[in-house]
């Protein structure tokens, strides 16, 4: 799975709409709910009048993992929810999720590492399975 230094990413030949549908289903399968969504394309068009390709940010949260993390460190709320993005560039659909291990490494708390690892594993599964064909 291609990644940046802070994301778990892949590309797919799926349409934008199909990729969003699959990401939502895989998030649910991994115990995540979508707390918010930001249609970046629509927002930039409305606020700036620019035309962009589809770009959607899904703010995902696994309640059990969030509860464990916030119980250990209440300030972690500033890093939540975990963002998953689906966007189109150059006729290709991209799916990316935040790498929770990288994100939580800035906190400097070793006791949070198991939670971060579990979130990373679950989000990596979402990104990977969203592009699988049956």
What do these predicted ranges mean?
Residues 24-25, 36-38, 132:
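N- and C-terminal low-complexity/disordered segments
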Residues 33-86:
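Compact, glycine-rich, soluble single-domain proteins
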Residues 21-22, 39, 118, 122:
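Short Gly/charged-rich anion-binding patches and loops
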Residues 106-134:
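Well-ordered alpha/beta subsegment
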Residues 1-30, 128:
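Terminal, regulation- and interaction-focused segments at domain boundaries
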Residues 83-109:
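Beta-strand/loop substructures that line and gate deep hydrophobic ligand-binding cavities in soluble
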Residues 13-15, 61, 87, 98:
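Solvent-exposed residues in well-ordered beta-strands and their adjoining turns
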